[in-house]
């Protein structure tokens, strides 16, 4: 692989409003720029962008105003601007909104190389959520966009299989998300209070299984006085669609006193939450590859997660405990796992080792660069292109 490439990255939000996708988009873009490539990023203006702008270390950052409903991300100036740019490769993150349509226009007009990262949006559960809107978008532009892509990037084998099942007949590259590894002490810091903390940190949305988690927590604390007295369930994250109030009501109806709703956490507050928790939980129904799990491992925390989180390496490495969404089954897992401090500590160490081995951003960016070089005619087909 030789020579600098002219790369474009297209996404919706350029700020923390993107949730886990923010770092998943920004980190490789910044690193590719640092490695000498020309990286231009195109996205949507939102209220949180001013605080995030300086963290983008790319050649060009272009933000565009939205007209109409925010969820559609209709920014016509993006499409007009993008269509005139002669990039070697364009990497689109996300589907079902105007940036996807703008990327499709670029691909059609420039005859370029389009890479699409759905980030789990083509998984069966995700396709069934808001199905009517997605069928309309598919008919209007998205189906043709997917079929015209040079490559669709999957985060894991399960996502690749879900994409392949759609019959798009497009090469699929498996490139996982990465994580920034913090410096952590070999000996954990002294506890600030007597209770241990089980942390959920992510988007507040039904697919995350938070209602089931609260129900299971209520069952578990009734059955286990030790869990009730020794553990706190902390639910942190931004509310995507006014789903938080019913969850707070549910916790009150169940009489839970060892539960805390912390709201969205960013920067140092997020780092403190990860560093200070004793275990991390993600009872999701559908994921691409959750950044939050990788971040928990980076902080040497044991993880409780469902198979839908799509990181089977965690189970194989002893870094994660398999859980289910069913409240009774999940309650049993909570009582069992959280009563084994040494096992939890071992899992946390295994998680950190797994993150160091497989999920550093340098490693993941190597794969991005190899894929783009192949598509630009400057390198061989990578072995992680599986279809």
Model segments located where?
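Aromatic "clamp/platform" in nucleotide-sugar-dependent glycosyltransferases that forms part
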Residues: 285
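Membrane-proximal helix-turn-helix segments that form the acceptor-binding/catalytic region
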Residues: 109, 134-151
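Short hydrophobic beta-strand element within catalytic cores of glycosyltransferases
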Residues: 302-306
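Carbohydrate-associated surface elements
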Residues: 158, 178
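Glycosyltransferase donor-sugar binding loop
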Residues: 42-48, 201, 230-246, 263-264
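Conserved acidic donor-binding segment of nucleotide-sugar-dependent glycosyltransferases
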Residues: 319-328, 336-341
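Nucleotide-activated donor-binding/catalytic signature segment of Leloir-type glycosyltransferases, i.e.
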Residues: 245-265
């Amino acid at each position: 692989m030789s020579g600098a490439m002219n790369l474009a990255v297209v996404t919706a939000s350029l700020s923390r409003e993107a949730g886990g996708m923010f770092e998943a988009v920004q980190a490789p873009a910044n690193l590719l720029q640092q490695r000498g490539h020309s990286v231009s990023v195109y996205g949507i203006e939102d209220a949180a962008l001013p605080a995030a702008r300086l963290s983008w270390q790319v050649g060009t950052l272009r933000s565009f105003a939205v007209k109409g409903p925010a969820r559609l991300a209709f920014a016509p100036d993006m499409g007009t601007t993008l269509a005139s740019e002669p990039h070697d490769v364009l990497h689109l993150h996300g589907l079902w909104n105007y940036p996807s349509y703008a990327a499709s226009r670029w691909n059609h007009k420039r005859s370029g190389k389009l890479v699409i990262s759905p980030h789990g949006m083509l998984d069966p559960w995700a396709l069934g959520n808001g199905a009517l809107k997605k069928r309309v978008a598919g008919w209007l532009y998205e189906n043709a966009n997917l079929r015209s892509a040079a490559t669709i990037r999957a985060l894991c084998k399960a996502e690749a299989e879900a994409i392949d099942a759609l019959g798009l007949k497009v090469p699929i590259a498996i490139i996982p998300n990465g994580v920034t590894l913090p410096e952590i002490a070999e000996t954990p810091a002294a506890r600030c209070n007597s209770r241990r903390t089980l942390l959920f940190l992510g988007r507040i949305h039904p697919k995350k299984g938070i209602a089931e988690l609260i129900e299971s927590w209520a069952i578990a604390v009734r059955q286990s006085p030790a869990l009730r007295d020794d553990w706190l369930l902390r639910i942190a994250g931004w509310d995507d669609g006014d789903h938080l109030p019913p969850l707070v009501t549910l916790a009150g109806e169940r009489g839970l006193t060892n539960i805390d709703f912390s709201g969205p956490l960013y920067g140092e507050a997020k780092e403190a939450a990860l560093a200070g928790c004793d275990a991390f939980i993600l009872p999701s129904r559908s994921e691409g590859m959750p950044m939050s799990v990788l971040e928990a491992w980076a902080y040497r925390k044991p993880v409780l997660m469902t198979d839908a989180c799509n990181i089977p390496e965690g189970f194989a490495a002893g870094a994660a405990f398999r859980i289910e969404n069913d409240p009774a089954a999940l309650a049993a897992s909570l009582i069992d796992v959280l009563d084994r401090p040494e096992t939890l500590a071992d899992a946390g160490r295994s998680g950190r080792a797994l993150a160091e081995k497989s999920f550093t951003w340098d490693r993941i960016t190597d794969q991005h660069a190899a894929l783009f070089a192949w598509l630009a005619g400057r390198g061989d087909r990578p072995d992680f292109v599986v279809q």
